[in-house]
Protein backbone atom coordinates (compact mmCIF):
# COMPACT_ATOMS: atom_id res chain seq x y z
CA UNK A 1 0.00 0.00 0.00
CA UNK A 2 2.78 2.41 0.94
CA UNK A 3 4.69 1.49 -2.19
CA UNK A 4 1.63 2.23 -4.35
CA UNK A 5 1.22 5.64 -2.72
CA UNK A 6 4.88 6.44 -3.35
CA UNK A 7 4.59 5.40 -7.00
CA UNK A 8 1.50 7.57 -7.53
CA UNK A 9 3.20 10.52 -5.82
CA UNK A 10 6.32 10.12 -7.95
CA UNK A 11 4.23 9.87 -11.12
CA UNK A 12 2.33 13.02 -10.17
CA UNK A 13 5.57 14.91 -9.53
CA UNK A 14 7.08 13.73 -12.82
CA UNK A 15 3.99 14.67 -14.84
CA UNK A 16 3.88 18.10 -13.18
CA UNK A 17 7.56 18.65 -13.96
CA UNK A 18 7.04 17.58 -17.58
CA UNK A 19 4.11 19.99 -17.90
CA UNK A 20 6.19 22.86 -16.54
CA UNK A 21 9.06 22.07 -18.90
CA UNK A 22 6.71 21.99 -21.90
CA UNK A 23 5.13 25.29 -20.87
CA UNK A 24 8.56 26.91 -20.48
CA UNK A 25 9.55 25.79 -23.98
CA UNK A 26 6.44 27.38 -25.46
CA UNK A 27 6.46 30.55 -23.37
CA UNK A 28 7.64 32.81 -26.20
CA UNK A 29 7.17 30.57 -29.23
CA UNK A 30 5.05 32.67 -31.61
CA UNK A 31 3.81 29.60 -33.50
CA UNK A 32 2.20 28.25 -30.33
CA UNK A 33 0.92 31.57 -29.00
CA UNK A 34 -0.74 32.72 -32.21
CA UNK A 35 -1.09 29.73 -34.51
CA UNK A 36 -3.70 31.04 -36.99
CA UNK A 37 -3.21 33.68 -39.63
CA UNK A 38 -6.35 35.46 -40.78
CA UNK A 39 -8.13 33.78 -43.67
CA UNK A 40 -8.00 36.61 -46.23
CA UNK A 41 -4.62 38.07 -45.33
CA UNK A 42 -3.23 40.43 -46.61
CA UNK A 43 -5.90 43.08 -46.87
CA UNK A 44 -4.31 46.52 -47.26
CA UNK A 45 -5.22 47.72 -43.76
CA UNK A 46 -4.03 44.46 -42.22
CA UNK A 47 -0.63 44.97 -43.82
CA UNK A 48 -0.43 48.42 -42.25
CA UNK A 49 -1.61 47.04 -38.88
CA UNK A 50 1.11 44.39 -38.94
CA UNK A 51 3.76 46.90 -40.04
CA UNK A 52 2.82 49.36 -37.28
CA UNK A 53 1.83 47.06 -34.40
CA UNK A 54 3.53 43.78 -35.33
CA UNK A 55 6.18 41.76 -33.51
CA UNK A 56 9.08 42.97 -35.68
CA UNK A 57 8.03 46.60 -35.32
CA UNK A 58 7.78 46.23 -31.54
CA UNK A 59 11.16 44.51 -31.26
CA UNK A 60 12.92 47.10 -33.43
CA UNK A 61 12.66 49.99 -30.93
CA UNK A 62 13.30 50.33 -27.18
CA UNK A 63 9.76 51.63 -26.61
CA UNK A 64 8.32 48.70 -28.53
CA UNK A 65 10.30 46.26 -26.39
CA UNK A 66 8.97 48.06 -23.32
CA UNK A 67 5.40 47.58 -24.59
CA UNK A 68 6.04 43.86 -25.12
CA UNK A 69 7.58 43.46 -21.66
CA UNK A 70 4.62 45.22 -20.05
CA UNK A 71 2.26 42.86 -21.88
CA UNK A 72 4.32 39.84 -20.77
CA UNK A 73 4.30 41.02 -17.16
CA UNK A 74 0.56 41.65 -17.31
CA UNK A 75 0.02 38.08 -18.52
CA UNK A 76 -1.35 38.78 -21.98
CA UNK A 77 -1.49 35.77 -24.30
CA UNK A 78 -1.25 37.80 -27.52
CA UNK A 79 1.76 40.07 -27.23
CA UNK A 80 1.46 41.77 -30.61
CA UNK A 81 -0.17 41.42 -34.02
Curated annotation (Swiss-Prot):
Signal peptide: none annotated. GO terms for biological process: mitochondrial translation. It is found in: Mitochondrion. It comes from the Eukaryota. Keywords: Mitochondrion, Ribonucleoprotein, Ribosomal protein, Transit peptide. InterPro entries: Ribosomal_bL34. GO terms for molecular function: structural constituent of ribosome. Component of the mitochondrial ribosome large subunit (39S) which comprises a 16S rRNA and about 50 distinct proteins. This is Large ribosomal subunit protein bL34m. The lineage of its organism: Eukaryota, Metazoa, Ecdysozoa, Arthropoda, Hexapoda.
